[in-house]
UniProtKB/Swiss-Prot annotation:
The gene is glnD. This is Bifunctional uridylyltransferase/uridylyl-removing enzyme. It comes from Vibrio cholerae serotype O1 (strain ATCC 39315 / El Tor Inaba N16961). InterPro entries: ACT-like_dom_sf, ACT_dom, HD/PDEase_dom, HD_domain, NT_sf, PII_UdlTrfase/GS_AdlTrfase, Polymerase_NTP_transf_dom, UTase/UR. Modifies, by uridylylation and deuridylylation, the PII regulatory proteins (GlnB and homologs), in response to the nitrogen status of the cell that GlnD senses through the glutamine level. Under low glutamine levels, catalyzes the conversion of the PII proteins and UTP to PII-UMP and PPi, while under higher glutamine levels, GlnD hydrolyzes PII-UMP to PII and UMP (deuridylylation). Thus, controls uridylylation state and activity of the PII proteins, and plays an important role in the regulation of nitrogen assimilation and metabolism. One of its GO terms (biological process) is regulation of nitrogen utilization. Pfam families: GlnD_UR_UTase (PF08335), HD (PF01966), NTP_transf_2 (PF01909). NCBIfam families: PRK01759.1, PRK05007.1, UTase_glnD.
Length: 876
C-alpha cells in the first residue's frame, strides 16, 4: 500500500515534513488510480474520508478530544463528503460558549499546521448562537451550514447546531428557495446565460456542478432530502432522471479531477491550456485539435443536460414550495394542449409518444400565443421521455414535416419557438444533422460559441432585422429583410449553414447538399431548394470578399457579381452574412465591417443593374472622381492650374482607388503643405468607412510600411487596410485604415499626439526593427502554421500573396520589414484577424516593378516563415 491510513500515524509521523510526504503519497496514489480508470466517485469520496481520518488524528494529537462542548465540523463541499485534489477544506470549530484564550491559541496552532501542510483550509470559529445569527443574515453561510457534518468532538454541540439549522425560523423554505433561484440567475448572468463559454468554469457555468448543488440545497431545505438518491425516493426525480444527473455529475467530476491533477493552485476554469492536458488525461486523442474538440463536445452536451434538468426540477419545486401544489386555472387551446398561467401543457399524459408530430404543434402554439412563455414541467418531463423513446427522427414523419415548414414560415417562430426547440432537444430530435452539431466546438479564439449555439444566435440576429430600432446598427438588412417574400428560405439556410461542421471535408459543400435534400423532402420547389443550397454553399463568400479582397478593384466586383448572379441572391446573402458575423463573436461586428459589406453590397448591386456585360469604364470613373474633387477644391479657393500641377505628379491609380471626397481632403492639405521635405500626416476627424483614415505623404524610404505599422502597433492601434501608392516623382501617398483596440475609430483627442509620433519616425528615416515580444496568455496554447500562398490573378504586373500566421504582437511590422529586406514594393494590404489567426492579403511587385517570379516567391515564403518563427517560436 503506497500510503498509510492517518488514523494509525504515530507521534514521530506528526511533523510537517512527515505529514506532507504522507499527503503527497496519497495524492500520487489517487492520481495513478485515476489514470487506471478507477471510478471518480470513489476517488472524490475517498479523498474526503482520508481527510476525515487525518483531521481526527490531529484533533487527538492536540488533545481536543478532551474538550467539553467543542466540535470540529465539515461544511460546504467537504460537508457533503466531496473533495477533489485542490478543493477547499471548509471547517467550522463549533462551541457552545466562546473559547477561552488558551483553547483559542491551541486551535490557532492546529489551523496553522494545516496551512503549513499546504491544504486549502477555509475556517470559522463560532458558537452555535453566532452560527444562527450569521447564517440568518448570509445565504452562503446558511447554505454551507446545511451541509454540516460532524468530524470529531462534542456530539451534543453539533446536535444543537442541527436543531438551529433545521428550524423553520432559520431560513423559511420559501424564502430560501427564492434566494437560491435568484442567486443562480445572477450566477448564470455572469456567464452570459449560456452553457457555452470558450473557457468554462466547471462549477459555476450554467449547467455546471453548482446547478446540481442548487437542486440538492433546495430539496434538502424543503423536503429533507440529503442526496440525489433521496430526491428520487421522494418522487421529485424519476429513476431515469436520477441516473442521468448522477451520470452528468460523474463526468463533470472526472473533468474537474483531471484539471486539479494538472494545476498547482485551486481553479475550476477549463482554460485553453488546460483543455489540452485534460483531454489527454481523459483519453481523448485525435489529429490536431480533434481530441480537445471531442472532449469539449461531451462537456458541453453534459452541461446542456444538467441545465435542462435543473430548469425542469426548479419549476416542479416552484409549484410545490411556493404554490403548495395549487395550480392556476387551465385555458383550453385545443384537444391536445392547454395554457396554465404563462405555461403550455399537454392535456394527455402520453400525447407525444402516441403522436410525436404534436411536439411541433406545441411550438406552433408558443409562436402564436404571446402569453405563453415556457413549457410546464410535467410536459417537459413527458417531452424528455418521448424524445428518448423515438425510434426515428421526427423529420421522417410526413405530418411533422408539414408542421416544421409551417413553423419556419411563422412570423414569430424566430424569437418564440426555435430557441426553445433547441433548448428542449427538439431540433436534435427532428434533424440527425443538428444532433451531430450539438456541443460541437472549435478550439480557437474566433468561434465563441458551439456550432449549435451559434446557429441559434444567427436566427435571433435575423429576427432583429425586422425591428426598425436596429436600423442604425444594420441599415441594409433592416431595409431588405422586411421586403423579402420568402423569409423561410433564409431561415432554412441559417439552420443548415454550419451543419456540416465536425465531419471532415468542406462543411459548406456538405451542408448545401443536405439542405437541398431537406427542402425537396419538405415540399419546397426545386428553385427554392437550389437557392437555399446556394446560400449554404456560399455563406462565407461575401465576408471573405469584403474583408480579404480589394473591393475597390472593378474586376473583384465583377467576379463577385458573377457568382451572385442576381439581386435576390445578393439580398438573401447579405442578411445571412451579417447575422453570421454577429452570431460568431459579439466583438466581431463593428462599423468597419458594416462599411465594408455595405460598399461591396452597393457596388455589386450597381454592377448587376448595369449588366455584367457592361463593366465600369475605368477611365470614366477616374474622370468622374477628378471632376468632383476639382469642384470641391475650387470651392476651397484653389485654382485649376494649381490643381492640375499637383495632379500631374500622381498616377492614375490614385484617382481610381480614392473617392472624390478623399482626393479633395488629401489635396487641400497637400496644396497648403509648404515644406515638401517634411512628412505630411492626416487623420480623418470623422469615422471614414467605419475607422480612422491615416494619410501619409512623404519622400519614399526603405521599410516605410514596416515603420508606420510598428508605430501604430506601439500605440495599440490595428491596421485593417492599406493603400500604398507612389507619385511619379518619388513620394508616397499611403492610406491606412486604422481601428483602436475596441474596433472603433480613434478618439479625436488622440489625433495630434499620433500625428507627432508618426512624423517623428518618418523623419528619423531608419527602418524600425521588431524585437520578439511575449505572446499574450490567450494565444500561448494555439499553434498556427505560417502559410504563404500566391493566388492566381488577372494582373500580369502584380503578385497577390495570402499570408496566414499566429496573430502575435509585431507580426505586421515583421512582414513589412521582410518586404523591405527583399526590396519588394507593397501596393495594397487587407489585414484580417480571425481569433488567433492573422489572414492577410498583400499586393506586391519586385524591384523591377513587375510580378514576382517563382524563385522570388519561394525566397519570400522562406524569409517570412523564418522571421515569424523568430517572432513567435512556440507558435509553429
Amino acid at each position: 500500500m503506497p500510503y498509510q491510513s492517518p488514523i494509525t500515524f504515530q507521534e514521530p509521523q506528526l511533523t510537517v515534513e512527515s505529514l506532507k510526504q504522507q499527503l503527497e503519497s496519497f495524492t500520487e496514489y489517487q492520481k495513478q488510480e485515476f489514470f487506471d480508470h478507477h471510478p471518480v466517485t470513489d476517488l472524490v469520496l475517498g479523498r474526503s474520508e482520508y481527510m476525515d481520518l487525518l483531521l481526527h488524528r490531529l484533533w487527538q494529537f492536540f488533545g481536543f478530544d478532551e474538550l467539553v462542548e467543542v466540535s470540529l465540523v465539515a461544511v460546504g463541499g467537504y460537508g457533503r463528503g466531496e473533495l477533489h485534489p485542490l478543493s477547499d477544506i471548509d471547517l467550522l470549530v463549533l462551541s457552545q460558549q466562546p473559547l477561552s484564550e488558551q483553547v483559542a491559541n491551541k486551535i490557532s496552532q492546529f489551523l496553522t499546521l494545516l496551512w503549513d501542510l499546504k491544504l486549502e483550509i477555509g475556517h470559522a470559529v463560532r458558537t452555535v448562537e453566532q452560527c444562527a445569527e450569521i447564517g440568518k443574515a448570509d445565504l452562503t453561510v446558511a447554505t454551507n451550514l446545511q451541509e454540516a457534518r460532524l468530524l470529531c468532538g462534542c456530539e451534543e454541540t453539533f446536535h444543537r447546531l442541527k436543531m438551529v439549522i433545521h428550524s423553520e425560523s432559520f431560513w423559511p423554505s420559501e424564502i430560501f428557495y427564492q434566494a437560491k433561484v435568484r442567486e443562480q440567475k445572477e450566477r448564470h448572468a455572469r456567464y452570459h446565460d449560456t452553457t457555452y463559454n470558450l473557457e468554462p468554469d466547471i462549477k459555476s457555468t450554467p449547467g455546471g456542478l453548482r446547478d446540481i448543488h442548487t437542486l440538492s440545497w433546495v430539496a434538502r431545505r424543503h423536503f429533507g432530502a440529503t442526496s440525489l438518491y433521496e430526491m428520487s425516493r421522494f418522487g421529485f426525480l424519476t429513476d431515469a432522471e436520477y441516473r442521468e444527473l448522477v451520470e452528468c455529475q460523474d463526468f463533470l467530476w472526472r473533468v474537474r479531477f483531471a484539471l486539479h491533477i494538472e494545476l498547482k493552485r485551486y481553479d475550476n476554469r477549463l482554460t485553453f491550456a488546460h483543455q489540452v492536458q485534460v483531454a489527454r488525461h481523459l483519453g481523448y486523442f485525435g489529429e490536431g485539435n480533434r481530441g480537445i474538440e471531442m472532449m469539449m463536445k461531451e462537456f458541453f452536451r453534459t452541461l446542456r443536460r444538467v441545465a435542462e434538468l435543473n430548469k425542469m426540477l426548479l419549476k416542479i419545486f416552484d409549484k410545490a414550495i411556493l404554490n403548495n401544489g395549487e395550480e392556476a386555472e387551465a385555458v383550453i387551446i385545443d384537444d391536445d394542449f392547454q395554457r396554465r398561467g404563462n405555461m403550455i401543457e399537454a392535456r394527455k399524459p402520453a400525447l407525444f409518444q402516441a403522436r410525436p408530430e404534436t411536439i411541433l404543434d406545441m411550438f406552433l402554439h408558443m409562436a402564436s400565443d404571446s402569453t405563453i412563455e415556457s413549457v410546464a414541467p410535467a410536459t417537459m418531463r413527458q417531452l424528455r421521455t418521448a424524445r428518448r423513446r423515438l425510434n426515428k427522427f421526427l423529420h421522417t414523419l410526413p405530418a411533422a414535416r408539414e408542421k416544421f415548414i409551417e413553423l419556419v414560415r411563422h412570423p414569430n417562430a424566430l424569437h418564440k419557438a426555435f430557441s426553445q426547440m433547441h433548448k428542449l432537444g427538439v431540433l436534435a430530435a427532428y434533424l440527425p444533422q443538428w444532433n451531430q452539431i450539438v456541443g460541437q466546438m472549435q478550439f480557437d479564439l474566433f468561434h465563441v460559441y458551439t456550432v449549435d449555439e451559434h446557429s441559434i444566435r444567427l436566427l435571433k440576429h435575423i429576427h432583429l432585422f425586422s425591428d426598425a430600432n436596429n436600423h442604425d446598427r444594420h441599415p441594409i438588412c433592416c431595409e431588405i429583410y422586411p421586403k423579402i417574400q420568402k423569409k423561410e428560405l433564409l431561415i432554412l439556410a441559417a439552420i443548415f449553414h454550419d451543419i456540416g461542421k465536425g465531419r471532415g471535408g468542406d462543411h459548406s459543400e456538405i451542408g448545401a447538399d443536405e439542405a437541398f435534400d431537406f427542402c425537396i423532402e419538405h415540399g419546397l420547389s426545386k428553385p427554392e431548394a437550389k437557392l437555399v443550397a446556394w446560400l449554404v454553399k456560399n455563406h462565407l463568400l461575401m465576408s471573405v470578399t469584403a474583408q480579404r479582397r480589394d473591393i475597390y478593384d472593378p474586376d473583384v466586383i465583377i467576379e463577385f457579381a458573377k457568382k451572385v448572379r442576381d439581386e435576390e441572391r445578393l439580398e438573401y446573402l447579405v442578411c445571412l452574412t451579417v447575422a453570421d458575423i454577429c452570431a460568431t463573436n459579439p466583438e466581431l461586428w463593428n462599423s468597419w465591417k458594416r462599411t465594408l459589406l455595405a460598399e461591396l453590397f452597393y457596388s455589386t448591386q450597381r454592377a448587376l443593374r448595369r449588366g455584367l456585360e457592361n463593366p465600369v469604364d475605368v477611365r470614366e470613373r477616374i474622370r468622374h472622381n477628378q471632376q468632383m474633387a476639382s469642384a470641391l477644391l475650387r470651392k476651397e479657393g484653389f485654382s485649376s492650374r494649381e490643381i492640375e500641377v499637383l495632379w500631374q505628379r500622381f498616377k492614375a491609380d490614385y484617382f481610381l482607388r480614392h473617392t472624390h471626397k478623399q482626393i479633395a481632403w488629401h489635396c487641400t492639405h497637400l496644396l497648403r503643405h509648404e515644406d515638401s521635405s517634411k512628412p505630411l500626416v492626416l487623420l480623418s476627424k470623422k469615422a471614414t468607412r467605419g475607422g480612422t483614415e491615416v494619410f501619409i505623404y512623404t519622400k519614399d524610404q526603405a521599410a516605410l510600411f514596416a515603420t508606420v505599422v510598428a508605430e501604430l502597433d506601439r500605440r495599440n492601434l490595428n491596421v485593417h487596410d492599406a493603400q500604398i501608392m507612389a507619385s511619379k516623382d518619388g513620394y508616397v501617398l499611403d492610406t491606412f485604415m486604422v481601428l483602436d483596440q475596441n474596433g472603433q475609430a480613434i478618439e479625436e483627442d488622440r489625433h495630434q499626439a499620433l500625428i507627432r509620433h508618426l512624423v517623428h519616425v518618418l523623419e528619423d528615416g531608419r527602418p524600425t526593427t521588431q524585437k520578439a515580444r511575449r505572446i499574450p496568455r490567450n494565444l500561448q496554447h494555439f499553434k498556427v502554421k505560417t502559410q504563404v500562398d500566391f493566388l492566381p490573378t488577372k494582373s500580369k504586373k502584380r503578385t497577390l500573396m495570402e499570408f496566414v500566421a499566429l496573430d502575435t504582437p509585431g507580426l505586421l511590422a515583421t512582414v513589412g520589414a521582410t518586404f523591405a529586406e527583399l526590396n519588394l514594393d507593397l501596393h495594397a494590404a487587407k489585414i484580417t484577424t480571425i481569433g488567433e489567426r492573422a489572414e492577410d492579403l498583400f499586393i506586391l511587385t519586385n524591384a523591377q516593378g513587375t510580378r514576382l517570379n517563382e524563385e522570388e516567391e519561394q525566397h519570400l515564403r522562406e524569409k517570412l516563415i523564418e522571421h515569424v518563427a523568430e517572432l513567435a517560436p512556440s507558435a509553429q
